[in-house]
Design a protein with these regions (language model features):
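Short amphipathic alpha-helical segments, especially helix-boundary/capping motifs
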Residues: 1-2, 14-18, 29-33, 72-77, ...
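Acidic/histidine-rich alpha-helical segments that form the ligand environment
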Residues: 7-11, 18, 76-112, 128
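Short, helix-capping/interhelical loops that line the mouth of catalytic, cofactor-
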Residues: 1-4, 51-94, 143
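Amphipathic, soluble alpha-helical interaction motifs
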Residues: 14, 18-21, 25, 55, ...
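Alpha-helical bundle segments that constitute or directly flank the non-heme di-iron/ferroxidase center
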Residues: 1-24, 47-58, 130-133
């Protein structure tokens, strides 16, 4: 189980410099109007971090809270496309450092007993890191 923690640490350390290497125009370019830009994908990862943070906090004291979000609405309403890239990256980094701290705390507890959205916290933590890596690959892929 600790493997995903190490993967998460590596992602947090590497992702900011990987993003900084992307040309500003390419980072904001939308392949088609209905699809997210790389910048908006970063915004989606911010929304995911915030939503998952609430899941992990609430599931420790509530019985199986149901916490969902509409990702397209969140992305549009947050106006990530017009936001400063550095501000988004700083927010992403702060949220994920806090999630990493929380994950390290949670792995000492019985994660198979606590649930959120009918899924164990153990599953949700590993899935969060896999989701982050999936979108990291999307962002880093050549357009």
């Amino acid at each position: 189980m600790d493997n995903f923690i190490q993967d998460f640490e590596v992602l947090i350390a590497a992702f900011p410099s990987e993003l900084s290497a992307i040309d500003t125009i390419a980072f904001s370019a939308k392949p088609v109007p209905e699809r997210w830009s790389k910048k908006e994908i970063l915004g989606h990862l911010i929304d995911s971090a915030m939503t998952n943070y609430l899941r992990f906090i609430r599931a420790q004291s509530e019985e199986n809270p149901q916490i969902f979000y509409t990702q397209d609405d969140f992305c549009e309403n947050a106006n990530y496309q017009q936001s400063e890239t550095k501000q988004l990256l700083d927010l992403w980094l702060a949220l994920n450092k806090q999630l990493l701290f929380l994950f390290k705390t949670l792995i000492t507890k019985s994660l198979t007993m606590r649930k959120c959205n009918d899924l164990t916290l153990a599953f949700l933590m590993e899935d969060y890191v896999a989701h982050l890596n999936h979108h990291r690959q999307q962002i880093l892929a050549k357009s």
